[in-house]
């Protein structure tokens, strides 16, 4: 009786927890994604990097530099001789100027620099998209994992209720002398095993909620419930997925952008072969005053302008070395793109195989779970009537529980594969 009371206590706690969860707000997957996108720290850091790249895109390479100078200097010279008293001669000097320097040609380097800044901005924006996709993938995976674990828990609750009913029935039959004490003890062992299993599964569900809440970064005290059903999208076509992956996969887009930056780096180095032409102009003012002489001063002022050209005719083959290295970097970026493309397309094929297999297995296991449920209902009735032993009933019970768990596992794997395919095809943020 003590074991029965213990199992009833466990069942009451779990049912109370289930009722509390039902009373909480249901958090949809879309709401969870929005919460994560708003609060995730890694995404905030990536967005700040994007703002830095935005600040770096300026017209500075095309614009002149303007500088201004000003100066005031006072000089005191003391003159003395044997025939006169010492005298102090003071001079005051004032000068000011403004200059403008403008590079008007540098082998088109300024245009390449600006274009490179824009490309780096595009890459930063692409990294934000990748971070968003990664976060959405994690949120979806954890969300559906909670659904699976909760369904595991529900099936464990059902199994515990059946084991409790079996034990009570076995105890009554034992008191009537219908069964032996050995069968009663076996029923008690199975009841205890199901009690332990349900407590372990309840801990698994709680841990899944904690991991999910950490991912949302919404505070561990956040209370919510989630939906209890996993729905697979209509079956996807592999040819369509291949085409979309090559065009829209964000990792491949980032690799293509990196290749373009390498090309621009090569263009910048090539610009070193050309002369640079600068235009400069300015205005200078200078005034020197002699206070000891009335109305005595010297003043100059005026404009200046001119052009200046610099051409590095020979640099000890440094320019040639830099161009050679830039070409190698460009080749490396092209090879890196091909490597990433090969890796991603290979992952696509593997995921699609897992996806199709997961759908097929899910259909099989769904049918098996329904058959197992029907068989369990029949077995329960036969057990109550005494035409089925406790050990035989336990086998039906385990078959039902295993069928439910296999169905949930297959459904979860198919859904995770579906999410992975949408990620590779660039569809996850649509």
Regions from the PLM with identified roles:
Residues 2, 134-246, 351-354, 358, ...:
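Periplasmic alpha-helical coiled-coil/stalk elements that build and connect Gram-negative outer-membrane
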Residues 69-102, 226-234, 267, 280-311, ...:
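Small/polar, glycine/serine/threonine/aspartate-rich low-complexity segments that form flexible
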Residues 24-145, 277, 281, 317-320:
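Short flexible linkers and secondary-structure junctions
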Residues 1-9:
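Bacterial N-terminal signal peptides that target proteins for export
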């Amino acid at each position: 009786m003590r074991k029965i009371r213990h199992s009833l206590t466990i069942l009451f706690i779990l049912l109370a927890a289930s009722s509390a969860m039902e009373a909480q707000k249901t958090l949809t997957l879309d709401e969870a994604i929005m919460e994560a996108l708003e609060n995730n720290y890694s995404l905030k850091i990536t967005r700040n990097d994007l703002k830095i790249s935005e600040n770096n895109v300026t017209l500075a390479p095309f614009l002149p530099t303007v500088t201004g100078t000003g100066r005031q200097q006072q000089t005191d010279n003391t003159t003395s001789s044997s025939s006169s008293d010492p005298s102090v001669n003071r001079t005051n000097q004032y000068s000011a100027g403004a200059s403008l320097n403008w590079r008007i040609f540098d082998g088109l380097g300024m245009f390449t620099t600006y274009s490179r800044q824009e490309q780096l901005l595009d890459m930063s924006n692409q990294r934000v998209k990748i971070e968003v996709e990664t976060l959405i993938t994690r949120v979806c995976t954890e969300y559906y994992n909670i659904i699976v674990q909760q369904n595991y828990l529900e099936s464990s609750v059902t199994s515990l209720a059946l084991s409790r009913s079996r034990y009570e029935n076995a105890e009554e039959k034992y008191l009537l002398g219908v069964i032996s004490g050995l069968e009663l003890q076996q029923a008690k062992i199975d009841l205890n095993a199901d009690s332990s299993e349900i407590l372990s599964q309840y801990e698994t569900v709680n841990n899944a909620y904690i991991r999910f809440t950490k991912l949302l970064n919404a505070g561990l005290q956040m209370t919510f419930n989630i939906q209890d059903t996993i729905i697979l999208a209509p079956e996807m076509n592999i040819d369509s997925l291949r085409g979309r992956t090559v065009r829209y996969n964000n990792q491949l887009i980032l690799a293509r952008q990196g290749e373009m930056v390498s090309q621009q780096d090569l263009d910048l180095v090539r610009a070193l072969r050309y002369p640079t032409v600068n235009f400069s102009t300015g205005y200078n003012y200078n005034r020197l005053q002699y206070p000891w002489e009335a109305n005595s001063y010297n003043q100059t002022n005026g404009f200046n302008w001119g052009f200046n050209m610099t051409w590095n005719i020979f640099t000890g083959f440094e320019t040639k070395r830099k161009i050679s290295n830039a070409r190698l970097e460009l080749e490396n970026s092209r090879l890196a793109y091909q490597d990433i493309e090969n890796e991603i397309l290979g992952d696509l094929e593997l995921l699609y195989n897992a996806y199709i297999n997961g759908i097929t297995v899910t259909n099989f296991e769904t049918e098996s779970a329904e058959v197992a449920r029907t068989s369990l209902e029949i077995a329960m009735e036969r057990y109550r009537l005494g035409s089925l032993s406790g050990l035989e009933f336990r086998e039906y019970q385990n078959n039902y529980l295993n069928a439910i768990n296999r169905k949930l596992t297959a459904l979860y794997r198919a859904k995770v594969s579906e999410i992975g395919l949408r990620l590779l095809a660039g569809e996850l943020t649509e």
